[in-house]
Swiss-Prot record:
This is 4-hydroxy-tetrahydrodipicolinate reductase. One of its GO terms (biological process) is diaminopimelate biosynthetic process. It catalyses: (S)-2,3,4,5-tetrahydrodipicolinate + NAD(+) + H2O = (2S,4S)-4-hydroxy-2,3,4,5-tetrahydrodipicolinate + NADH + H(+); (S)-2,3,4,5-tetrahydrodipicolinate + NADP(+) + H2O = (2S,4S)-4-hydroxy-2,3,4,5-tetrahydrodipicolinate + NADPH + H(+). Its main location: cytoplasm. Pathway: Amino-acid biosynthesis; L-lysine biosynthesis via DAP pathway; (S)-tetrahydrodipicolinate from L-aspartate: step 4/4. It comes from Photobacterium profundum (strain SS9). NAD(+) binds at residues 8-13, 34, 98-100, 122-125.
């Protein structure tokens, strides 16, 4: 049984992760953390998640609970995640990262940490989204050279980063399949007289509204036809279940940088 720690347990994803961990047949909840100023310190994690008492109280010091978990799942903020990575390095723990919005410099730090500990990092832990990434690679190889490629994503009003990590992941999958680097071909905003689009650019459009859990569409548009590959999430539990699955998988692997493609074995398709 893999003992899991949940960082940011009181957040929207944190509560779903608590449920997914407790409901898993292969994992057990070992630790649940929150910020030191949180009024929820000391509250039972199960009560917080609405699943009843689990005899695990919310704590504010992950280091003091280092003996109580094997893998940390972190869906928080870049500054918090980077600090938790250092803690995992110090105590020889493994980490599943669902946080998005890292800078290129911060991504380098994560890559370096993977030389010492095992890390799974993905922009999205849904099985369906990760299958979409693979489908996009296939579509880009067949259609990318002669179509206009656009990515449209929609999320709830509270999401703080844009485009979403999943949208960027879609762009990276497409660009990589075409032998390009996303940063060289991405267009994140259009306004005013922009002129005609170039053939090689990948455009992004972002919607923030209401309570949309997550919707992503990649469009390959030609004259006379277009192909759209879409994923719609209606419940955050799909992300939480995928993250717990990744944590269980990671427990059996050595130091290195892994993605959900590795967890699901999609690289073999």
């Amino acid at each position: 049984m893999v003992r899991i720690a949940i960082a940011g347990a009181a957040g929207r994803m944190g509560r779903q992760l608590l449920k997914a961990t407790v409901n898993s047949e292969k994992a057990a909840l070992g630790v649940a953390t929150e910020r030191s100023e949180s009024t929820l310190i000391g509250v039972d994690a199960g009560e917080l998640a609405g699943i009843g008492n689990v005899s695990i109280a919310i704590v504010d010091d992950l280091a003091k609970a280092a003996n109580d978990f094997d893998v940390l799942i972190d869906f928080t903020a870049p500054v918090v995640t980077l600090a938790n990575i250092e803690l995992c390095k110090q105590y020889g723990k493994k980490i599943v990262i669902g946080t998005t919005g890292f800078s290129e410099e911060e991504r380098v730090l994560i890559d370096l940490a993977a030389k010492d500990i095992a890390i799974v990092m993905a922009p999205n832990y849904s099985v369906g989204v990760n299958l979409v990434f693979k489908l996009l690679e296939k579509a880009a190889k067949v259609m990318g050279g002669y179509t206009d490629i656009e990515i449209i994503e929609a999320h709830h009003r509270h999401k703080v980063d844009a485009p979403s990590g999943t949208a960027i992941g879609m762009g990276e999958a497409i660009a990589g399949a075409m032998g390009n680097k996303l940063s060289d071909v991405a267009v994140y905003a259009r306004e005013g007289i922009t002129g005609e689009r170039t053939r090689d650019e990948i455009g992004f459009a972002t919607i923030r509204a209401g309570d949309i859990v997550g919707e992503h569409t990649a469009m390959f548009a030609d004259i006379g036809e277009r192909v759209e590959i879409t994923h719609k999430a209606t419940d955050r539990m799909t992300f939480a279940n995928g993250a717990v699955r990744a944590a269980v998988w990671l427990a059996d692997n050595q130091s290195g940088f892994y993605t959900m493609q590795d967890v699901l074995g999609l690289d073999d398709l």
